[in-house]
């Protein structure tokens, strides 16, 4: 009889890798799915849902991400400060031009599980608007995504 083995947290931390993703001309949703899978560790053979076994992901050129269709014009993103009249509305064009890092972070966060691990998983995501990032010392593996 074959027994399944569960991944231990210490082993998962020791096996973590760094990946670099260039978001130039990639569709937001398709990029977010791949990034969320890597952050959770679903690309690994020993995936365990209750252990944070995912890798680190650095996303560069976030201001060059693409929204398909009319989403840049018609879709809005909302923030509320929890004060009266504190609702902020931002269009897709504004989110891409000014807050592209927050746009990708929100999209990936929505694809993560809604439990205690979500914050730990999201802390392994680093997003930069241009191609300069301070993670050269980690020697990230360049991940080529063919998503169009």
Swiss-Prot record:
This is Large ribosomal subunit protein uL13. Gene3D superfamilies: Ribosomal protein L13. Belongs to the universal ribosomal protein uL13 family. InterPro entries: Ribosomal_uL13 (IPR005822), Ribosomal_uL13_bac-type (IPR005823), Ribosomal_uL13_sf (IPR036899). Pfam families: Ribosomal_L13 (PF00572). Part of the 50S ribosomal subunit. One of its GO terms (biological process) is translation. GO terms for cellular component: cytosolic large ribosomal subunit. The keyword Ribonucleoprotein applies. Keywords: Ribonucleoprotein, Ribosomal protein. GO terms for molecular function: mRNA binding; structural constituent of ribosome. It comes from Ureaplasma parvum serovar 3 (strain ATCC 700970). The keyword Ribosomal protein applies. This protein is one of the early assembly proteins of the 50S ribosomal subunit, although it is not seen to bind rRNA by itself. It is important during the early stages of 50S assembly.
């Amino acid at each position: 009889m074959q027994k399944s083995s569960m991944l231990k947290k210490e082993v998962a931390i020791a096996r973590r890798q760094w990946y670099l993703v260039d978001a130039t001309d990639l569709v937001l949703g398709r990029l977010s799915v791949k990034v969320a899978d890597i952050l959770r560790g679903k690309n690994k053979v020993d995936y365990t849902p209750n252990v944070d076994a995912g890798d680190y992901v650095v996303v560069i050129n976030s201001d060059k991400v693409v929204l398909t269709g009319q989403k840049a014009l018609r879709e809005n993103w909302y923030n509320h400060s929890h004060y009266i009249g504190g609702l902020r509305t931002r269009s897709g064009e504004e989110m891409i031009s000014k807050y592209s890092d927050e746009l990708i972070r929100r999209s990936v966060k929505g694809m993560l599980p809604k439990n205690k691990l979500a914050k730990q998983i999201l802390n392994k995501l680093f997003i930069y608007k241009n191609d300069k990032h301070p993670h050269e010392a980690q020697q990230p593996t360049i991940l080529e995504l063919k998503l169009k």
